[in-house]
Every structure is written in structure tokens, then in C-alpha cells.
Amino acid sequence: NDTPGFLGNRVGVYAMQIAMTEDFKMKLSIEEADAIFGRPMGIPKTGVFGLYDLIGIDLMADVLKSFIKELPEKDEFHEVAKEIPLVKKLIETGYTGRKGKGGFYRMNKTGATKIMEAINLETGDYSPTKKIDVKSDKVDLKGLIERKDKYGDYAWSVISKIIKYASSLVPGITKEFNDIDEAMRLGFNWAKGPFEMLEEIGVKNFFDKINNFSGNSFLENLSKTKNEDFY
């Protein structure tokens, strides 16, 4: 089956947008979001905001417009691709990422001193970056989403939505769900794809926590069988 853009790009860009929009909603710092949507999830350490800066914020805006144009209106991608005022302002003022004056992160040079700064999503102001430690006794995905703090809430919100979106593409876009996992491993350098994440979290655990997945035939079928070895 065909799909606008490569399969990995569709899921990968959706994942980036979910990680970003959920951070705007939950009001974590961008350092916190990148610390969670990074190594703890088996995702490169750039996270989402660092990756945005690396790719180019203006280029990402063009990528989103392309997907919006090509994907049907009912596709959930549209919900996470809406223009964000702060992002629009960054582009307009030349803060397009590493190739520009900076982006979500910037290097502030004062004489011989260089200080890495991060933007505040609410105010648009920059301040020195803070090192975030999200380590816990449980370092697997299941342990991460079961944390009783804002990091656990953010991790679950992001991971569950990525899994829901990826599974909505089966079997309409691809008949083999592991094709999506392979695309994410090869194209975005993830340690595990969405369905491998689901397997690690545990099928029963996933459905104990998730609320609505109506219309998603893959998840509806899996919820009936509760097959932990679906992979």
C-alpha cells in the first residue's frame, strides 16, 4: 500500500508533533521533554526540540504543510500539525534552528563566554539550560510510564498516542505492523518501534491505562485477545 511520504516519516513526524504539543499542554520545560522523549524511550538524545533545531524549524513547517495537504482530513495527523504561534514567531525572527540564530535552544555568546540557553514555551524568553535527571529504579518503558509524577504522565501521553496513531495505519497503509517498527528503527534511529514499545509495556497494562481507541481495528482486535505475544 502507498502513503504520502515514507511510512517512517509519517509516523516519525507525528511522534515529534505529539511530543511537542503535549509539552505545550503539560508545561514541562523543553529540557524535561527532551530528557524523556529521548534516551529513556530509546529515542536519540536530541529529543524533539533538539531534533527540530537540527532539522530546521522552517523546514519542519514545510514538512507539516505537505502532510496536511496530502493526508485525508480525518487523519489524526491534522490535530498535531496545527500552527503554533511561538513556532511561527521563531521562524519569522530568524530563529530557525542550528542553521539560524538558534531555535528552541541557542548559544548565547558574551565575549569569550558561551552559554547554552533554552526557550520558555510560555514566555518565549531564554534562560541557561538545566540538566534534567529522569533516572529511576525502573529504567524500562513500563517503569517510565508508571511513574507517579509529571514525567510519567508525559511519557504515557506521548507513547500511547504514538502507538494509537501507528496502529491506525494497519492494515490500511501497511498490512505488516512490523514494517512501521523497522521504518522507525532505520529512518529515525529509534531503538524500538511503536509496536515493540507496546510489547515492552505489556498488552494488558496498555489496555488498563488507555481510554479511547474506537475505530482503530488493530487495537480493537488486540483488546479482545489480550495476546501478550502478538508480535
Which residues make up each language-model segment?
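N-terminal glycine-rich phosphate-binding loop for ADP-containing cofactors
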Residues: N1-Y231
